[in-house]
Curated annotation (Swiss-Prot):
This is Cuticle protein CP1499. Calcified shell. GO terms for molecular function: structural constituent of cuticle. It comes from the Eukaryota. Keywords: Cuticle.
Amino acid sequence: TIQDAPDVAAEKARFFLAYQAALPATPPKPADPPKWYGPLASKIPAGLPGSSANVALTADLSAARNAFYNTYNAQVAAVAPKSDGPVFAVVPVATSAQWTGPVAATLPAGVPGSSPNVAETADVLNAKNAFFTTYNQQVAAVAPAPKV
C-alpha cells in the first residue's frame, strides 16, 4: 500500500481527534415512531353494501329501500329488449393434444442430401441422368479452352 505523506497523515490524525472529541456532545438519534400494526385502510369497510353499517337499519328504512329496488328492477325489466330468437348454448372447445415430436426446424424439408419422402422410380432416375449428361455436354461445348 502507498503510505500517506507526513502532512496528510498529520491532518488525518487531527481530524480523527476532533471527531472523537465532538462525538459525545452529539445528541442521540431520536427513537423511531411506533409502526402501525392495525389493518390496512383498504381492508376497512367504508359503508359499502354488506359491510357493517355505521347506523343500524330501521324497519322504515328497510321498507323504503326495498320499495326503491322493486320499482327500479320493474323499470329495467320494462325497457329491456325482448329476445324472440333462439338461445344458443355455449359449448367449450375441446383442447387438442400437445405436439411432442421433434421441432419442425430439425426435420428435413427436401434439402439436398436429406432422405426424400417418396423414392424415385427407375424412369425418373433415367430422365435425371439423361438431363445431367446433356447439360454437362453443353457446358463443356461452350467452355473456353484451358490456358496452357
